[in-house]
From Swiss-Prot:
Name of the protein in its database record: Anthranilate phosphoribosyltransferase
Cited function: Catalyzes the transfer of the phosphoribosyl group of 5-phosphorylribose-1-pyrophosphate (PRPP) to anthranilate to yield N-(5'-phosphoribosyl)-anthranilate (PRA).
Cellular component annotations (GO), alphabetically ordered: cytosol
Residues binding Mg(2+) 2: 221-222
Superkingdom of origin: Bacteria
Organism name: Thermus thermophilus (strain ATCC 27634 / DSM 579 / HB8)
UniProt: anthranilate 2 binding residues: 164
Sequence positions that bind anthranilate 1: 78, 109
Family: Belongs to the anthranilate phosphoribosyltransferase family.
Pathway membership: Amino-acid biosynthesis; L-tryptophan biosynthesis; L-tryptophan from chorismate: step 2/5
Gene name in the database record: trpD
Length: 329
């Protein structure tokens, strides 16, 4: 029996079958009807970590290649789809982490649930989203930061985009987005839209040879200034509160974003170190987790302290300006 049919019948796929199914989807070899049946069946049954990892491998292989030599290579990324409409914290945290000396390949797309995804925000900040992949790779090598726009790096997604759009429900691709970094990031802070995905996504990361933290905070795919749940790859689960890392508690409301232009103005103030308060603290928390995940600091608390120093220095804004200019050169 073929693997697509097997999945539609609700059976768990072997690793090789999951890989083969995704390879076929990326090659446009699966009809829209069968593709829809497959995606819905997987979602209803619940994707297994070995299936997710195998599919991520196939998607990475179908992506436009980007060879980056710097290691560790960090990505701070979320699944999206949490419906919370928060400010794009992961994007700003990625710039802070890079300004603090960790090489970052930030993989992202346009908005999933907020009014502004990472691509929307960076575009409003002057970043050329359509820059050639090799130029983005050079930026990571030279500046320590690059934005990998999913639409540019994953052209094979055109085969499944209409099916996903028409279904309008969560599919395995919501989980695969963060795992398919074309530069092959090996350190992650990965936010998930629901706590049930913490352990499976951590296992998928481990199977892909990556380290890091899978996080969920009060219904959001981000670390928030309240109750967070974390699964550290290969190390287990724990709760995390802002007080433990020297930050003040704040409600989710305080982390809400607006449209791209509004967010861009706020982002500039944050990156220049001019914005104090909950948003700056939330960015420091995510960037601090990034420093810890990449092995830059021995603890999350020290990571947050370093992130606050970097934010206050305005270095992250200077890096953004250099990156914008580098892509235009």
């Amino acid at each position: 029996m073929d693997a697509v049919k097997k999945a539609i019948l609700g059976e768990v796929l072997e690793e090789e079958e999951a890989y083969e199914v995704m390879r076929a989807l990326m090659a446009g070899e699966v009809s829209p009807v069968r593709a829809a049946g497959l995606l819905v069946a997987l979602s209803l049954r619940g994707e297994r970590p070995h299936e997710i990892a195998a599919m991520a491998r196939a998607m990475r292989e179908a992506a436009r290649p980007l060879r980056v030599h710097r290691r560790p290579l960090l990505d701070i990324v979320g699944t999206g789809g949490d419906g919370k409409g928060l400010m794009n914290l992961s994007t700003l945290a990625a710039l802070v982490a890079a300004a603090g000396g960790v090489a970052v390949a930030k993989h992202g797309n346009r908005a999933a649930s907020s009014r502004a995804g990472s691509a929307d925000l960076l575009e409003a900040l002057g970043v050329d989203l359509e820059a050639p992949p090799e130029r983005v790779g050079e930026a990571i090598e030279e500046l320590g930061f690059g934005f990998l726009f999913a639409r540019v790096f994953h052209p094979a997604m055109r085969h499944v985009a209409p099916v996903r759009a028409e279904l309008g429900v969560r599919t395995v691709f919501n989980l695969l987005g963060p795992l398919t970094n074309p530069a092959g990031a090996d350190a992650y802070v990965l936010g998930v839209f629901s706590p049930e995905w913490l352990a499976p996504m951590a296992e998928a990361l481990e199977r892909l040879g990556a380290r890091g933290l899978v996080v969920h905070g009060e219904g959001a795919d981000e670390l928030v200034l309240g109750e967070n749940r974390v699964v550290e790859v290969g190390k287990g689960a724990y709760a995390l509160t802002p007080e433990e890392v020297g930050l003040k508690r704040a409600p989710l409301e305080a982390l809400k974003g607006g449209g791209p232009e509004e967010n861009a103005a706020l982002a500039r103030r944050l990156l220049k170190g001019e914005e104090k308060g909950p948003l700056a603290d939330a960015v420091a928390l995510a960037a601090g987790a990034g420093f810890y995940a990449a092995g830059k600091t021995p603890s999350l608390k020290e990571g947050v302290a370093l992130a606050r120093e970097v934010l206050a220095s305005g270095e992250a804004y200077l890096l953004l300006e250099r990156y914008v200019a580098f892509l235009r050169a």
